[in-house]
From Swiss-Prot:
Single annotated GO MF: lipoate synthase activity
Species the sequence originates in: Leishmania major
Cofactor: binding details: Binds 2 [4Fe-4S] clusters per subunit. One cluster is coordinated with 3 cysteines and an exchangeable S-adenosyl-L-methionine.
Designated name of the protein: Lipoyl synthase, mitochondrial
Domain called Radical SAM core: residue spans: 140-362
Length: 410
């Protein structure tokens, strides 16, 4: 039936109303079509003008290539290096996850995983869903150094940072008194010369688990005396006496992550952690050990920070005496965690690495896939530690010579 056709039993008034409605609908459709046509014309005009503007631009800063490569003579900045992409969009091409290779390619990967399973130990590599697990566990190349980050005091954390995928619990299971021996044995079986040991926060324990961590460190070093050991630890409620207990253990590197810039810390980290408390922890380690302990921290990008804030965070860490720093891209581990605000371009990470080294950091690893323990045992940082050990050995030898000379004179 035609839309304007009206049954004979309908009154003339109703028929007239129906005709008006039909006419109105047709005019509305016509109006929408006219608007769409005009919008399309305006769009074409805008695109033509925009293309002409790009062609006539002499600065080199307003073309698409400038998002990837900066024009010569233009200083890099976080804003000029690359576009912002939000978490709901596809990952940019520079975010690539490395799939772990099999036994024939990375026998160390399987050996580390098997050792962890047999001793019922946790690794932050697995619990935090680190994208670099294949590279670190298997070594960065055929001759690379395999590195694993063992997580002590269980797999449940008492804090609930909004970026972290580690399980949380107000009342985690009790500590395993055999864990120090298990960890030491696992490290020995791995056959590595550098290991990272981290911890879950245990606010349910009076000392935050500091004594247990110290026991693990001493046991590991006793069974593996030549091992270089990095401990990535919490803030222990801000209790500096507990920090001192760890600082005097035979550690090679004392690491504590500041995580993000100060402004967004309250919405990113658990309320019991704070930016200033983390800085105080790192600074106290440096002062307590007279600068002899190498300290390290890490910053995530992509949480809503500004360029000036990242720069200030680097300055704050350096002022606190931190010697090594890592910067990496935050990736949302699950839909319940914070969303990514942007994906920083690799050029931006290169910029931060240069600025960090210019500020006086001894070591900086900066890249989209870098994490706090990423390639922790790589050559450069190991070389720093060996140089420090040699210097300390030289001082000890000189002191012994002076004592012997004094005895001979007496």
């Amino acid at each position: 039936m035609c839309p304007t056709a009206v049954p004979s039993r309908v009154s003339p008034v109703a028929a007239a109303a129906a005709a008006d409605i039909a006419g109105s609908s047709e005019s509305t459709v016509s109006l929408v079509a006219d608007v769409d046509k005009k919008n399309s014309q305006y769009k074409q005009i805008f695109l033509e003008r925009f293309r002409k503007k790009l062609q006539s631009d002499k600065t080199g800063m307003n073309n698409l290539e400038s998002f990837v490569e900066l024009p010569e003579g233009v200083a890099p900045s976080a804003a000029s290096i690359g576009p912002i992409k939000r978490g709901s969009e596809p990952l940019p091409p520079w975010i690539k996850l490395k799939v772990p290779k099999g036994m024939t390619h990375r026998p160390r990967f399987n050996r580390i995983r098997r050792s962890m399973r047999e001793k019922n130990l946790s690794t932050v590599c697995e619990e935090a869903k680190c994208p670099n697990i294949g590279e670190c566990w298997g070594g960065s190349d055929e001759e690379g150094t395999a590195t694993a980050t063992i997580m002590v005091m269980g797999s449940h954390c008492t804090r609930g940072c909004r970026f972290c995928s580690v399980l949380t619990s107000r009342r985690p299971p009790p500590l395993d008194p055999e864990e120090p021996e298990k960890v030491a044995a696992a490290v020995h079986e791995m056959g590595v010369d550098y290991i990272v040991m981290t911890m879950v926060d245990r606010d349910d324990l009076p000392d935050g688990g500091a004594s247990h961590v110290c026991c693990c460190i001493h046991t590991i070093k006793k069974k593996n005396p030549e091992l270089m050991l990095e401990a990535l630890v919490g803030d222990f409620h801000g209790d500096l006496k507990l920090v001192e207990q760890l600082a005097v253990t035979p550690l090679s590197v004392y690491a504590h992550n500041i995580e993000c810039v100060e402004r967004i810390t309250p919405r990113v980290r658990d309320r019991r952690a704070s930016y200033r408390q983390s800085l105080q922890t790192l600074e106290h380690v440096t002062k307590w050990t007279n600068g002899n302990m190498l300290t390290k921290s890490s910053i995530m990008l992509g949480l809503g920070e500004e360029e000036a804030e990242v720069r200030q965070t680097l300055r704050d860490l350096r002022t606190a005496g931190v010697s090594a720093v890592t910067l990496g891209q935050y990736l949302q581990p699950s839909h319940t965690r914070l969303k990514v605000s942007r994906y920083a371009h690799p050029k931006e990470f290169e910029m931060w690495e240069k600025e960090a080294m210019d500020m006086g950091f001894l070591y900086c690893a900066s890249g989209p896939m870098v994490r706090s323990s990423y390639r922790a045992g790589e050559y450069y940082i190991k070389n720093i530690l060996k140089q420090r050990q040699s210097a300390e050995g030289g001082k000890a030898a000189a002191a012994a010579t002076a004592v012997n000379a004094g005895t001979a004179i007496a």
